[in-house]
From Swiss-Prot:
The gene coding this protein: menD
Cofactor needs: Mg(2+); Mn(2+); thiamine diphosphate
Stored NCBIfam families: menD
HAMAP family: MenD
Similarity field: Belongs to the TPP enzyme family. MenD subfamily.
Designated name of the protein: 2-succinyl-5-enolpyruvyl-6-hydroxy-3-cyclohexene-1-carboxylate synthase
Oligomer status and interactors: Homodimer.
Native source species: Aliivibrio fischeri (strain ATCC 700601 / ES114) (Vibrio fischeri)
Disulfide bonds: none
Role of this protein: Catalyzes the thiamine diphosphate-dependent decarboxylation of 2-oxoglutarate and the subsequent addition of the resulting succinic semialdehyde-thiamine pyrophosphate anion to isochorismate to yield 2-succinyl-5-enolpyruvyl-6-hydroxy-3-cyclohexene-1-carboxylate (SEPHCHC).
InterPro entries: DHS-like_NAD/FAD-binding_dom, MenaQ_synth_MenD, MenD_middle, THDP-binding, Thiamin_PyroP_enz_TPP-bd_dom, TPP_enzyme_TPP-bd
Length: 576
């Protein structure tokens, strides 16, 4: 094949790939630099309907795409060059495989004749993401012997699998050189002739209709509704959480809402009060659990569920197993909002009047327990000006201005679960694999998708791990505040039953670093408050304008000591 023909074929295939992805719902593409990916990069950059995002670090790029997909609920494409650039996407792909954000991984590759022969920047990219993707497509090198219809069909099938299952798809694209040259459409007129109707249209080449099961009323629903039950809300959207809470209200059941849901109920702080044996036993009187979504932060609620042996219903739109305790249960794969609405309507349609008297006493007692547990936590946080991780978690949900939230996987997410008041907030997390990598990049992706002010809470080790992604903050389209809780290492390990020397050496790993120079290097406004009120003022001022890094320094081990005292007090208190 003549060089000019290969240039054209590379470019035409890349254009077909990008166009068909757009027709399948892709609106954002995240691109890292590289020569082998030139055909894809040029095709994406010239597409009028795409928003383009760039980053020099492929690991951060993958998490940026994850954040955009998380907030937009759309598939997001990622373009990287060959070699370890591809391998750096694995952490974000592993997360999306568990939490089902739709990533489309377009990885440029060497042609087959340059694999396993000592060629530069060539690794075996086929199957590199293993079971972490829902579908893999290994393309041949662009050739006139492979019809354009074949390419479009395979792309559509990959997108359809993703639409049905969620998660990432991997499309490996081996482009032979050359990549650069003048475009001459006349060279491929005959090759493109069979898809002229597709080119004149705006629909995908193959149009498949996904299977949506109609939500029907659960068997024995009216008997279930008369039981003493509890609604557990896991990692769901705020809209879904509100629908689940409304159903609970119709049933007269308490709501235990995970902070990731953005919903705050009167029975909150259960990760505290479930440490009290009387509360644990009282909750165990329930006869039915309705759980919406999974990925619960609370270990105590997880322990209670492990001991629970009665009727258990789990509702989630995805098909993977979400039952770590291996309970016998009824699983509904359904849209959560629709399921809740259908079952709530059935109660109204039948004009049901339930006798909630048997449930009132224990439900009200747990409500009182929640209030008293929170009061004990507040008393443990000393005075109103003390700035600690505990006092911050107790306050930030109430005092922070309206914005989106991104909460990292450090001690802060557990403190918010225990003591926070995140009510009617859009809360985003990476609680699938729950890694500490890529948190800043994911937060930026969420902000870009929603175009709203965002508050991100991360730990010091997490920020050190994703320091490169501070460069992405300049892409934010609205005010953004990153709060780093600096307890000099892995404070989340403070409660481990390990001697202090080994705990420091192998778990906390103190670093004695602070982040003012990092903020300066990336051109960020930096603040270091000394009091709680000052911290809240800085956060709220930052959410009005600009991009800010706020560092909250607390002594190493302080949170562990406070929590140990609090847990001991909770365990022996009369909470109701």
């Amino acid at each position: 094949m003549q060089p000019e023909q290969q240039v054209m074929l590379n470019q035409v295939w890349a254009e077909l790939i990008i166009e068909e992805l757009v027709r399948n719902g892709v609106k954002h593409i995240c691109i890292a630099p590289g020569s082998r990916s030139t055909p894809l990069t040029l095709a994406a950059s010239e597409h009028a309907l795409l928003s383009i995002h760039t980053h020099f670090d492929e690991r951060g790029l993958g998490f940026l795409a994850l954040g955009i997909a998380k907030a937009s609920n759309d598939p997001v494409a990622v373009i990287v060059t060959s070699g370890t650039a591809v391998a750096n996407l694995l952490p974000s792909v592993a997360e999306s495989g568990l939490t089902k954000e739709k990533l489309v991984l377009l990885t440029a590759d060497r042609p087959v004749e340059l694999i396993n022969c000592g060629a530069n920047q060539a690794i075996n990219q086929q199957g590199i993401f293993s079971s972490h993707v829902c579908h893999s497509l290994q393309l041949p090198s662009p050739s006139q012997n492979v019809p354009a219809q074949w390419l479009l069909s395979r792309l559509d099938q990959a997108c359809f699998v993703q639409q049905e299952q969620g998660g990432a798809i991997h499309i490996n694209c081996p482009f032979p050189e050359p990549f650069y040259g003048k475009k001459d459409d006349s060279l491929l007129v005959d090759y493109l002739a069979p898809i002229q109707n597709w080119k004149a249209d705006t629909s995908s080449y193959i149009q498949q209709t996904p299977y949506f099961s109609h939500v029907t009323l659960s068997p024995n629903w009216m008997q279930t509704a008369r039981k003493k039950g509890v609604v557990i809300i896991g990692k769901v959207s705020l809209e879904e959480a509100n629908c689940a809470a409304q159903l609970a209200k119709e049933l007269g059941w308490p709501v235990l809402a995970d902070p990731q849901s953005g919903y705050y109920s009167e029975w909150a702080h259960y990760d505290l009060w479930l440490q009290n044996s009387a509360c644990f036993e009282l909750l165990s009187e329930v006869e039915c659990v309705l759980q919406f979504g999974a990925r619960l932060v609370s270990k105590r609620l997880g322990a209670w569920l492990k001991n629970y042996q009665q009727a258990y219903y789990l509702i989630d739109p995805h098909s993977e197993l979400l039952n770590e305790s291996c309970h016998a249960h009824v699983r509904y794969r359904a849209d959560i909002s629709t399921w809740c609405q259908t079952h709530a309507d059935s109660l109204a349609d039948r004009d049901c009047v339930f006798d909630h008297a048997p449930s009132v006493h224990w439900s009200e007692s747990l409500k009182v327990a929640s209030q008293n547990a929170l009061a004990l936590a507040r008393s443990m946080a000393c005075n109103s000006e003390t700035l600690s991780e505990l006092s911050f978690a107790l306050t930030v949900g109430q005092k922070a201005n309206d914005c989106d939230w991104f909460v990292g996987n450090s001690l802060i997410v557990r403190l918010l679960d225990m003591t926070g008041e995140l009510n009617q907030k859009n809360v985003y997390t990476n609680r699938g694999a729950s890694g500490i990598d890529g948190l800043v990049a994911t937060a930026v992706g969420v902000q870009l998708a929603n175009d709203k002010p965002l508050l991100a809470l991360v730990g010091d080790t997490s920020l050190l791990y994703d320091l490169n992604s501070l460069a992405l903050l300049k892409q934010a389209t609205q005010p953004m505040v990153v709060v780093v809780m600096n307890n000099d290492g892995g404070g989340i390990f403070d409660l481990l039953p390990v001697n202090e020397k080994k705990k420091d050496d192998f778990y906390r790993m103190p670093h004695q670093l602070e982040f003012s120079h990092a903020a300066a290097m990336f051109g960020l406004s930096y603040h270091r408050p000394e009091t709680l009120s000052c911290a809240m003022s800085m956060i709220n001022d930052g959410l009005e304008k600009g991009i800010h890094l706020i560092e909250i320094n607390t002594p190493a081990g302080q949170s562990g000591e406070e929590l140990t005292r609090l847990f001991q007090t909770i365990q022996h208190a009369a909470l109701f």
